Each structure stands twice: as structure tokens, then as C-alpha cells.
Amino acid sequence: MRDLAAEIRVTAVPAPAVALWWLGQLSFVVKGQGCTLGFDLYLSDYPGNVSRAYPPLAKPADLAGLDIVFCTHEHIDHLDPWTLAPLATASPDAVFVMPEACLPLVKEILPSGRVVGSKADTPLRIKGVEIWPIPAAHDRLAEGETGYACQGYIVRLAGITLCHTGDTVMYDGLIERLRERRVDVLVAPINGLDYFRTKRDIVGNLSAREAAELAVAADVKLLIPAHWDLFAGNAENPGHLFEHLARFHPEQPCHYMARGERFIYCSCPAGG
């Protein structure tokens, strides 16, 4: 079996480029020169949780060397206590970034000095990485006393601007936020929402078509779809996304990531 944790550690990424690994759902590791980020890492499979379609692709205790770990909202497949606790031990220098509304959920799990509460549209700079938190609408914008409880993160790493939307549907202002930051790589959910899943208390996301149209409208250089494969009752066929792009926007780059795939994105000019 492939050792993803070891592969992440030994992969050398020259600037201006980043390496991405997809670990299922919206779980990603992004590595640039001198810094490694984790997004919504969900690497547990405990009784009582919703059954996974496949086992975790890595053990959190093996993921050493992470510098910043993002959790976009409170749902367990995005903020997983059984992942965060061993991850904090394996990567003792990691800083954990999450919406301020999530801070009480990790009070007994993570050292307070290593946790940063984010507010949407209030930029951060951590370990040299520029971070712009943005609202996420899951499945509506919810702003409370501590700000938006669900957020996405735009990061600038090794000359690349990447947006991990978190769980979200479309809302006024999302396109403009992405365009303002000139996003290179957009990671977005495509599992959609519908009446029947809503009746089962499954909170929805962008559909494949909406994710495609968002990428085009925001003029992003590459779309990576996610959040479509892990739970049988909330899955989607990614082929719908590629069919839509092929018919209506054949000029929009989009990359299908296999489970555990390492993908290198480079912004080098042609011939450079």
C-alpha cells in the first residue's frame, strides 16, 4: 500500500508551484516551497460516525510536518476530533485555523496557543502564508456574534493562489471575492443539494454545474472538484461536471483527482 504520509514529507516542490493530495471528501494537503497546509482533514473511521465508502488514506499520527491546518466548519467530516488530536501531536508546530464559532469545539482537543479563530474578509498572515477567509453558505450564509460559522480560505503559497471554498452554495459576492484575489486553483464541492437529502438533514453544496459556472465566472485557472465520493447517501457523479464543461465551457481547465493522487500545479509561463 502506498505510504501517502511519507510521499508528502519527501516531495520537493520548487516555486512557483504547489503539490496537492486529495484524501477524499474535502480533505486536501497542499505543499509549497517551505510550507505544508492541510484542509478539512477527515482521517478517522469510528463507530457511530457515518460509514465511509473507503478507509482513510492516511493516519493522522503519520502526518508529520504540517505547518497550517484549516477547518472550514463544525461538521465532523471537516472538523474531526479523532483526526485533530493525533495530528497536533504528529505536527507539533502546526497552527490550526478555523472560524471563531468553532473554537469551543476544540478547546479540549488542541492547545489554545496553536489555534487561530478567523473572521471572514479579515486577512491573516501565518508562517509567511497570506490567508483571506471568505464566507461560506452551507446551505445559507449564517453570521452570528462571532462572525460566519462556515468559511472558505483563499491562500497565497509559493506564488500560487488557491481557494478551498469549504462546504458552500452560491451566494452574492462569492464570484467577486475569487476574482479580486485572482485565484489560480479552485477546490470546490460538487455534490449539490435536493429535496430528498434535505429531508434527511443533509446540508447541500454547489452542484457540478454551479461549480463549473463559478470557475468560469471567477476566471480561475483550474477547477478541482471534490466532496462527491465518500458517503454513499451524499455522492455525485463527477462526470456531470466534465460533461457540462465540455458542452458549454471547453476552454475552462478542470482536473479530476484520483484518491490519494499527487498533482503538481505550476504557474510557470510557457517556455519558462
What are these regions (language model features)?
Residues 30, 40, 73, 80, ...:
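Divalent metal-coordination and catalytic microenvironments
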Residues 95-97, 101, 169-259:
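Cap/insert and terminal regions of metallo-dependent hydrolase folds
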Residues 3, 8-11, 32-74, 81-89, ...:
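Pre-active-site segment of Zn-dependent metallo-hydrolases
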Residues 45-46, 75-79, 103-106, 122-125, ...:
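Active-site environment of divalent metal-dependent phosphoester hydrolases
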Residues 57-124:
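Active-site HxH/HxHxD metal-binding segment of metal-dependent hydrolases
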Residues 12-59, 68, 146-166, 185:
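Conserved beta-strand hairpin/beta-sheet module of binuclear metal-dependent hydrolase folds
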Residues 2-15, 98-160, 244-269:
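Metallo-beta-lactamase
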Residues 23-27, 31, 124-184, 202, ...:
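Catalytic core of the metallo-beta-lactamase
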